[in-house]
Regions:
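Long, charged alpha-helical interface segments
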Residues: 125-197
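A glycine-rich helix N-cap at a beta->alpha junction
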Residues: 58-61, 111-114, 139-140, 148
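Short phosphate-binding loop-to-helix
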Residues: 57-78
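A contiguous pocket-lining binding segment that forms or flanks enzyme active sites
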Residues: 104-135
């Protein structure tokens, strides 16, 4: 099951992908209303939204997890196999960085998660797979582990064949997609794949 989460970052014009259920975290409810969408679940402490929507699951402001993390937990409890998190970039830098790190949290729970904001898609990847891109647009791979060994790629202007992407270095910044689907094979480590669609 694919679940969409609306977070409370910057509200950018974004193409929504098909989903089975929608969870709104705090201010994400405002974005759902702006898009004339009815969420299946609403949760959070609502410090950003400023009021408590009807039928919302309400949590205290003094808690040890963010509203977006709560939404991921909820999605997993509902049986999600994939999660797309919208509107979680922009705004406060600390929230933005933690939202990106929540991709690892979802992965640890056995769920594939992506952040989608405007024309930007961020995914935490390892192993091998094919990914949506846009011909002519930038693709970057940011090392998430200390080192990632990329053994093969297809669909990139600058092939990533048998290279080591090291955290803190910029070797894999600003590649270019040569087609609308790219393939990346990683022998070890993890990278944040950032595609601009």
């Amino acid at each position: 099951m694919k679940i969409a989460i609306f977070s409370g970052g910057e509200f950018l014009k974004t193409q929504l992908l098909p989903y089975d259920k929608l969870i709104c975290a705090d201010k994400g409810y405002e974005y759902a209303k702006a898009l004339n969408l009815t969420p299946d679940f609403i949760l959070g402490d609502f410090d950003s939204l400023g009021y408590m929507p009807q039928s919302a699951e309400i949590f205290p402001k003094d808690k040890n997890f963010s509203d977006t993390e709560l939404a991921i937990k909820k999605a997993v409890s509902l049986g999600a196999t994939e999660i797309d998190i919208y509107f979680s970039l922009g705004g406060r830098l600390d929230h933005e960085l933690f939202n990106i790190n929540l991709l690892k949290y979802a992965k640890n729970l056995g769920v594939t998660a992506n952040i989608i904001s405007g024309n930007t898609v961020v995914s935490l990847i390892s192993g091998n797979g094919s990914y949506l891109a846009k011909k002519g647009n930038n693709v970057s791979l940011v090392p998430f582990s200390d080192e990632a060994h990329i053994i093969k790629s297809k669909g990139l202007k600058y092939p990533l064949d048998n290279i080591k992407a090291v955290r803190g270095e910029t070797l894999t910044l600003s590649n270019v997609a040569t087609c609308d689907e790219i393939y990346i094979e990683i022998a070890s480590g993890e990278v944040l794949l950032i595609c601009f669609l």
